[in-house]
Amino acid sequence: MISVRIGGAAVRIHFSFFVFNALIFLMRSSSLILSFYGVCLLHESGHLAALKLTGGRISSVDISGAGAVINTRKGGIATAKNRLIVLLAGPAANIFAYLMLSLFGCHGKFPQLSLIAAVYNMLPYHSLDGGAIVSLFSVGTAYERAVNSILTAFKMLVIAVSAAAAYFVGREAFPLFAASLALFTGDIARRR
């Protein structure tokens, strides 16, 4: 892990980020890679802008193969409403970019990846925005256990479907399988 401080916030880049990048560079074209990183930067900028607007402050940023996690300082975005705004801001930035670029006739890789990133980040995995939103409303409630059971079944279905896609479609669909397996494994590790 590489760790630096930027503006008082700890920024940690985990080994899995470098492994993920190596796989991307092996399997994809350079224009797709640049679009991918642009979409990721746009997504995280949406979160950061909302965090700033709601009075939150960053304590650390963890960058791994599963994505980026922005941790806030205590006393920042304390209300559930503000946390929800910050969590939705990343996917909203991606959807806004997709709509604006499509409106002006740009139908290339960047708008497509932007829409995919918005949908992907709303999946109910703990390391993604969708999972954080589910946790925001279910942790500590009487429904927490039932919600976790339903989500586990959903995640296993996603793994099965992505494995079938990788088998029938081939190499192009393999990243879907790898991502669904990595996200599920991350959720299991997080529970321990």
Q: Where does each model-flagged region fall?
A:
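Hydrophobic transmembrane alpha-helices and their immediate loop junctions
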Residues: 1-192
